[in-house]
Amino acid sequence: MFRSRSWFGGGWNRPKNRLSLDHLKYLYSVLERNTTVSENNRGLLVESLRSIAEILIWGDQNDSSVFDFFLEKNMLSYFLHIMRQKSGGSSFVCVQLLQTLNILFENIRNETSLYYLLSNNLVNSIIVHKFDFSDEDVMGYYILFLKTLSLKLNTHTIHFFYNEHTNDFPLYTEAIKFFNHPESMVRIAVRTITLNVYKVQNPNMLQFIRDKTAAPYFSNLVWFIGKHILELDACVRNDTE
């Protein structure tokens, strides 16, 4: 009975200081003991992920050892492992994972911490992960995550997202797949992402966009705008008749 309770992160060894390296170590042990998502542990995992984001944001400004531990244990790989599961409750946990990632990247201020987070390519693996976009919450937090990442783009960080050797740019190519999404907030986010990308002065990246994506994306964008102009024209004509 006691082992079962401990397995799901019983509170006996939980550090009293919520924002501390010790608490992050405790939460890491929770992830280690709950590598498979189930209906029984999904609530625990969601709460752990939420707390991890809070500790990392605090550590970014107050204690560099927090990020050192997060990177040493490669905790982003645990996030990706959870995302790739199809077990019961995994979609529910995916929503929290995307929330956690969005909060983390939105609030991180230390450039070194940001570079460390982006350096092992796990963020790109998360971007190309096949999420269940039929879930509105997953769709919403995914596109918000991409938008948050796009706000971090500059001449230095672009190299973490655009790979010149493989000529690949997942942040951009995955985002523009949703340019014509039925939800207006998703479409607006996609426009914001593309504009944030175009602002970065990287010749090879801009050449990639022109060669690989410009024709299908901009032709579809023009068609989309034209379609709405015709619909507006029809509405005006009906009102005047």
Model-derived features: where do they sit?
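Elongated alpha-helical scaffolds that mediate protein-protein interactions in large eukaryotic proteins
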Residues: F2-E174, F178-E241
